[in-house]
């Protein structure tokens, strides 16, 4: 038992540094371990939650987050805007010579004028899209309500009557040709009085009038009366 106790006393205990390894003049092992524990221990804020090591300012040797570079905004006077707008109305894509001329007139740099024209073109495209967007869902039938109706014609033109069809008279072919005499010519209309009653003609179609009688022409030369 005594031998085992001596062995345990001779063995270095875990968690402790053997004092024989440190030369004289160095602090004690317990003090060194305490310092190491403090350096590895995370920083704690007032609430007790570990917040990690505090970030140092750029002056302390560590870089912080890069600050966003602020853009310099150019302020245009009303006279400058008027000149730029008039030039934009004439030409939306001016060349280098036109921009340099505007720079001399307005007192601005050529680069500022180029940026202004780019922004102005983008603004115009945005305005055009905003105007066309409400009309995109409308159907073509909807546009018919916006169109004005054609004015009514104040004059009314009569419709032309249907064409009349002439039917040949049946007696023109049935009766043989007879010499034209006064008696037969006078009885001819009487014999045709019953035809319309027996054969009514359709509406809009009237029989052709009979051909006029052909009178014999005398080919003898006229006699001179002396």
UniProtKB/Swiss-Prot annotation:
Exclusively expressed in the developing pituitary gland. Its main location: nucleus. GO terms for molecular function: DNA-binding transcription factor activity, RNA polymerase II-specific; RNA polymerase II cis-regulatory region sequence-specific DNA binding. It comes from the Eukaryota. One of its GO terms (biological process) is pituitary gland development. PROSITE patterns: HOMEOBOX_1 (PS00027), HOMEOBOX_2 (PS50071). Residues 64-74 have a biased composition (Basic residues). Residues 1-77, 175-226 are annotated as: Disordered. InterPro entries: HD, Homeobox_CS, Homeodomain-like_sf, PROP1. It holds the Pfam family Homeodomain. Residues 69-128 bind DNA. It is found in: Nucleus. Keywords: DNA-binding, Homeobox, Nucleus. Residues 1-11 have a biased composition (Basic and acidic residues). GO terms for cellular component: nucleus; transcription regulator complex. Residues 196-206, 216-226 have a biased composition (Low complexity). Possibly involved in the ontogenesis of pituitary gonadotropes, as well as somatotropes, lactotropes and caudomedial thyrotropes. Belongs to the paired homeobox family. This is Homeobox protein prophet of Pit-1. The gene is PROP1.
């Amino acid at each position: 038992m005594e031998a085992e106790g001596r062995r345990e006393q001779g063995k270095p205990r875990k968690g402790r540094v053997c004092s024989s390894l440190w030369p004289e003049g160095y602090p004690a092992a317990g003090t060194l371990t305490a310092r190491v524990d403090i350096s590895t221990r995370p920083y704690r804020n007032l609430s007790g939650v570990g917040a990690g090591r505090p970030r140092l300012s750029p002056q302390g040797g560590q870089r912080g987050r890069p600050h966003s570079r602020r853009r310099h905004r150019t302020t245009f006077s009303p006279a400058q805007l008027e000149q730029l707008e008039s030039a934009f109305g004439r030409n939306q894509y001016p060349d280098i010579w036109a921009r340099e001329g505007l720079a001399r007139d307005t007192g601005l740099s050529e680069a500022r004028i180029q940026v202004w024209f780019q922004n102005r073109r983008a603004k115009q495209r945005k305005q055009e899209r905003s105007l066309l967007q409400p009309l995109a869902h409308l159907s073509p039938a909807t546009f018919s309500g916006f169109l004005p109706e054609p004015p009514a014609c104040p004059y009314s033109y009569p419709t032309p009557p249907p064409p009349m069809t002439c039917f040949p008279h049946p007696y023109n072919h049935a009766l043989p040709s007879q010499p034209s005499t006064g008696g037969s010519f006078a009885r001819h209309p009487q014999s045709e009085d019953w035809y319309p009653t027996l054969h009514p003609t359709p509406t809009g179609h009237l029989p052709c009038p009979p051909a006029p009688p052909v009178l014999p022409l005398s080919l003898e030369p006229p006699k001179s009366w002396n």
